[in-house]
């Protein structure tokens, strides 16, 4: 959490 990911936006987790 708190990670910048292009896939999940700014979540960093794929749920």
Swiss-Prot record:
Statement: the UniProt record of this protein carries the keyword Heme: yes
Cofactors: heme b; Ca(2+)
EC number: 1.11.1.7
Record's catalysed reaction(s): 2 a phenolic donor + H2O2 = 2 a phenolic radical donor + 2 H2O
UniProt entry keywords in alphabetical sequence: Calcium, Heme, Hydrogen peroxide, Iron, Metal-binding, Oxidoreductase, Peroxidase, Secreted
Domain of life: Eukaryota
UniProt-annotated location(s): Secreted
Record-annotated membrane-spanning stretches: none
Cofactor note: Binds 1 heme b (iron(II)-protoporphyrin IX) group per subunit.
GO MF term set: lactoperoxidase activity; metal ion binding
Any one GO CC term of the record: extracellular region
GO biological process: hydrogen peroxide catabolic process
Family: Belongs to the peroxidase family. Classical plant (class III) peroxidase subfamily.
Function comment: Removal of H(2)O(2), oxidation of toxic reductants, biosynthesis and degradation of lignin, suberization, auxin catabolism, response to environmental stresses such as wounding, pathogen attack and oxidative stress. These functions might be dependent on each isozyme/isoform in each plant tissue.
UniProt-recorded name of the protein: Peroxidase 6
């Amino acid at each position: 959490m708190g990670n910048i990911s292009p896939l999940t936006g700014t979540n960093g987790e794929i749920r």
